[in-house]
Amino acid sequence: MVANVSGIGSVLQQMQAMAAQANGGVASPAAALAGSGAATAGTFASAMKASLDKISGDQQHALGEARAFEVGAANVSLNDVMVDMQKANIGFQFGLQVRNKLVSAYNEVMQMSV
């Protein structure tokens, strides 16, 4: 139960960092990513790869928890499964929105006259 509380605290901290960045409270997106532990290197590509790997890992973990609950594992509760599934869903939705913004920015740059 203590691990669940610290996990929720970690997610809450990441959400607060993203909210501060959206409101202009964080100087740069790299600072928010560094604070959340998502970026390990200074390049955009490595930050994207780390974020995608984390999203994928969260999804795999949630699926593993769901399968364990389905077969009746004693150490897996429905609450844990639901929280992990929601964390994976939120991460995926965030990644999808980042992708949409990147595609939109790319299209805007491509439409600029040189």
From Swiss-Prot:
Top-level taxon of origin: Bacteria
Primary residence: other
GO cellular component annotations of the record: bacterial-type flagellum basal body
One Pfam family, short name: FliE
Gene Ontology MF terms: cytoskeletal motor activity; structural molecule activity
Keyword set includes Translocase: no
Keywords: Bacterial flagellum
Record carries keyword Zinc: no
A biological process term (GO) from this entry: bacterial-type flagellum-dependent cell motility
Cellular compartment(s): Bacterial flagellum basal body
Family that this chain belongs to: Belongs to the FliE family.
Protein name (Swiss-Prot/TrEMBL): Flagellar hook-basal body complex protein FliE
Species name: Burkholderia vietnamiensis (strain G4 / LMG 22486)
